[in-house]
Amino acid sequence: MSVIARARSGGLHKVSESYKKSRFALLAEHPLSTYYLIMGSTLLLLGLGLVMVLSASSVESVRVFGSAYTLAQRQALFAVGGAIALIFAARSSIQFWRKSAWVFLAIAFGLLLAVLVIGVEVAGQKNWIEIFGPFRLQPSEFAKLALVIWGAEVLTRKDRHIPTWRNILVPIVPVAVIMMILVLLEGDFGNTLMLAAILCGILFAAGIPVRLFAIFGAVGFFAVWALTLAAPYRMERITNWLDPESDRLGFGWQVSQGQYALGTGGVWGVGLGGSREKWGSLPEAHTDFIFPVIGEELGLVGTSAVLLLFGILAFSIFRLSRNSKEPFVRLAAAGVGSWIVIQAVINIGAVLGLLPVTGVPLPLVSYGGSSLVPTLISIGMLLACARNEPGARRIIRRRQTAAAMRRR
């Protein structure tokens, strides 16, 4: 090839690369890209969750109900209900969420107080309310959604009138602490941590000085340590986390079996439905420990896909929070992002032995309607926020106008 030909070839290659990069940049900067990334990653995680719940719950479902599909059918029902709620939430205006903030808070506190009186105990925790038949409600899951909406609304109002951080902390911190105490009284330590994570995410987005988070962290550490010492089973979990060999056949059994399942899967997995651990060796295989079943059946490829989807979802949500000029959107997105990301980190970290087991499910993937439906509603709210961004509104109006003209 001549020098001129090589130069032309190199030039064309550079133009092609530049075109690809510019095309990717245009897609990334599209006003609706955040909307589609949130929606796409959510639907993929939800779909994967339904498939894995069908596989992971089949043995337990046969043992309890005599059918391999009962738990999966219930999860599908939860997913349909949650998807309908997501659609309504995505079609709602930002003003609807702001006006409903105090209603959500009142309902959350009503349910948290009710569970102390009429709650039923499940797996050692009295944090469920019987609805009808086999269906139960976990108020602490709804409380997370309420705290996001109410906290974002309160701080949005204060952002306009009271700029000092001392006034920003009231009433959101006292109300959140009361909510955490009620959840803790029900024995739900995991969701107590999640409420704290949501509070920190909203306050960080509101611009609270970093030094205050150091104070909150110190207070939180001593509070968690005191609660751990007060409950022997929590101390056992911490001890086993620090020394996995201390009680491998007791408190450490679940984590050790989860890690064994992940190791068994290798790169490609043993195949969908082929898990051996779900046959009784791995407790809560379809709920808190569904991630090891994904690793066993779909291998490193499957677990990497889950991590990638959570990464895309997190990037999209925090991108919405960072770019939005609406204070409510910025704060609500930070709260939901902290909720989903930290819950996923705690769940997966516990499976890998990096964190103590706290009993929180993997968002959008684990079995359970009480966790799934509020999560989908919160994502629907963010989709509504993404649709209402100025650039997105212009594109939607143009599409609606073009569609109306085609119908004429």
Task: Please describe what each predicted stretch is.
Residues M1-K20, F24-A25, N347-R408:
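A juxtamembrane structural motif centered on a specific transmembrane helix
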Residues L27-T42:
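N-terminal membrane topogenic signal
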Residues M39-S55, S61-Q254, P292-A350, I377-M381, ...:
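Hydrophobic alpha-helical transmembrane segments of multi-pass inner membrane proteins, especially
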Residues S57-S58, L262, G266, L352:
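Short, small-residue-rich loop/turn micro-motifs
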Residues N127-P134, G252, G280, L355-P363, ...:
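Active-site-proximal inter-transmembrane loops
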Residues G133-A143, L185-G187, G266-G271, V360-L372:
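Glycine/serine-rich anion-binding loops at beta->alpha junctions
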Residues D188-L193, V270-S275, A285-T287, S304, ...:
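Transmembrane helix boundary and interhelical junction motifs in multipass membrane proteins
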Residues N240, P244-F291, L298-G302:
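TM-adjacent membrane-interface loops and short helices in multi-pass inner/ER membrane proteins
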